[in-house]
Amino acid sequence: MKVVFVSYEVFPFAKVGGLADVAGTLPKYLKKHGVDVTIVMPKHRIVEKNAEKFGYEIKKVAESLSVSHVKTDQKFDIYESVLPGSDVKTYFVANDYYFSAEDVYAGPDLGEQAIFFCAATLDLVKHLDLKPDIVHVNDWQTALIPVYLKTVYRDDPYFSRTATVLTIHNLGYQGVFDPKYLSFAGLPDYVYTIDGLEFYGQLNFLKGGIVFSDVINTVSPTYAEEIQTEEYGEKLDGVLRMRSKDLYGILNGIDYELYNPATDRYIYVNYDVNRLELKWENKVKLQEELGLPVNKETAVAGLISRLVPQKGLDLLVDVMDYLTLFDLQIVVLGTGDEQYENAFRKFQERYPDKVSANIKFDVELAQKIYAGADIFLMPSRYEPCGLGQMFSMRYGTIPVVRYTGGLADTVKEYDPQSMEGTGFGFKKYDSAHLLKAVSKALHFYYREKDHWRRIMTNAMNTDLSWDRSAKEYVDLYKKALAKVGR
């Protein structure tokens, strides 16, 4: 089975969010399950910068190629590399006009960029003769590929047996643009209807992918159910309900080689489930590095997140003053909306012995927090899958979450009777319930030491690997092939 896996960001070539982690790991595990997978992504400016840092080579294999169907004079080059730690070939669509910004999600025109990339990807596939059985696209930036295949390429024998899979990593980002982009894309007018890409007078790229893909999945079973409701459906719940028979939920995994406290080169002291006492050495070193009072007995709660409303930060901001009354230090890492960045900076000024606000993106510090914290905070308003809670569990750091989406599928409330469970959480979206969940975690941390150790071992022994997920994706690909009569 040949799969072309298309993503706008792939770790370690270019990373902004969790999509890059998925796209940089799932293909490795698909390969282990016998799938002949090839990655295609844009050649962002950061790709060359990261080559030395992450030890990969990149070379040009074709140049000055025209883009079919799109109304543009822009050409593209093709570059090639290999995904580090694997033998997965990765091809890059290179164009300095569209992909030279410092930020992966910046540039002269995001709509044009996505259209150019989608169309160029199909030209790349033909130019390199990749002959895919499956084209697997991710999120709105790549969602027009199934639209192209079902319309302007419908009678092209090269793609006649190719099936499409769309993975929705976050329904909140849809790629909504002026209808004029339809003409630029070279797509037929008939797709601009309520049953196609039309969306409240605009053009919705993700909706196009939902309508035209053979099968669709999102990144947890609970989120697949939630997005078919008005509350979580982001105005696409109707079309998702129409496609419900072709909509699946597959939990993401994490890369066990990359995220392993026994070998992680970024953390202060390596440890494993049989040497948990070494985890506290990481806490002491973290406190020292961040200028917090050093005390291995004091509970440390970590928050590593984009600082945006989706992440439930309004709840956390509401209860921060109360949380500082506990014997608790709170370490924040992330960037995002100015209101949250400023709020956490002010909390640090007000409570310098209690709060460390690190308003930046820092992979190394993130790993140190996963290893050094006792508790991991994730009170999300919604969470398609979430990786932070998985990373924290892998490192024996206990998640306190709102039970939604993938958080509900991965974190199980600890039951002291059965001694089963991996964390603590709450369902109702309000700050009082968050405070209650943190209080419960702190009760076990300070007063039920044996139970706390059991929760840590439960969390670290939970199977969160990509191996499990990859098997489910292989089954999904078979369902997609059945849709095209194969």
UniProtKB/Swiss-Prot annotation:
Binding residues annotated for ADP-alpha-D-glucose, in chain numbering: K15
Pathway annotation from the record: Glycan biosynthesis; glycogen biosynthesis
Tagged with keyword Transferase: yes
Gene3D superfamilies per record: Glycogen Phosphorylase B (3.40.50.2000)
One GO MF term: alpha-1,4-glucan glucosyltransferase (ADP-glucose donor) activity
Superkingdom, taxonomy of origin: Bacteria
EC number: 2.4.1.21
Keyword annotations from UniProtKB, A to Z: Glycogen biosynthesis, Glycosyltransferase, Transferase
GO biological process, one term: glycogen biosynthetic process
Enzyme kind, highest EC tier: transferase
Pfam families in UniProt: Glyco_transf_5 (PF08323), Glycos_transf_1 (PF00534)
Catalytic activity: [(1->4)-alpha-D-glucosyl](n) + ADP-alpha-D-glucose = [(1->4)-alpha-D-glucosyl](n+1) + ADP + H(+)
Family assignment from sequence similarity: Belongs to the glycosyltransferase 1 family. Bacterial/plant glycogen synthase subfamily.
Protein role: Synthesizes alpha-1,4-glucan chains using ADP-glucose.
Protein name stated in the entry: Glycogen synthase
Origin species: Thermotoga maritima (strain ATCC 43589 / DSM 3109 / JCM 10099 / NBRC 100826 / MSB8)
